[in-house]
Amino acid sequence: GIKGVFKELGVDYIIDGGQTMNPSTEDFMKAIDSINAKNIFIFPNNSNIIMAANQAKELSDKNIVVIPTKNTPQGFTALVNFDADASVEDNEQALMESLTMVKSGQVTFAVRDTVMNDVDVKEGNIIGIAEGKLMDAGESVDSITTSLVEKLVDEDSAIVTLFYGE
């Protein structure tokens, strides 16, 4: 799954979390303390936990760089752009810049009826969300995924990466 992809890209420690299980500063401190490295880069991959990552950075004696990734695609892109031979400063600059090039979306199930952004949603519908905004709703994962990709991709897009799973 996603954890395996991140491990293959060189991640030393993954803190489990999710939309309803936000890791604490203490969780970050445990991870930091378990890593034997001169420099540690943290990719929160969730806008709700960037503050906890920054608090852990302030509490630690180690050299910590928090790259404020707000979602998994940003974390993936940052990791792909990491250069083990570059300086900490050069990596930080490159990784921060890489975040500006990422557009992300997700396809999931609606948990209730709603109307948002002129999109009528029924509980159980498949919904497409891009950059935190509801874009589409319907019955088919394939059609909603295709619609979402079409809305995200433009003439400046170079790579499309899809992750499938929970």
Give the location of each predicted region.
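N-terminal loops that bind phosphate or other acidic moieties
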Residues: 1-166
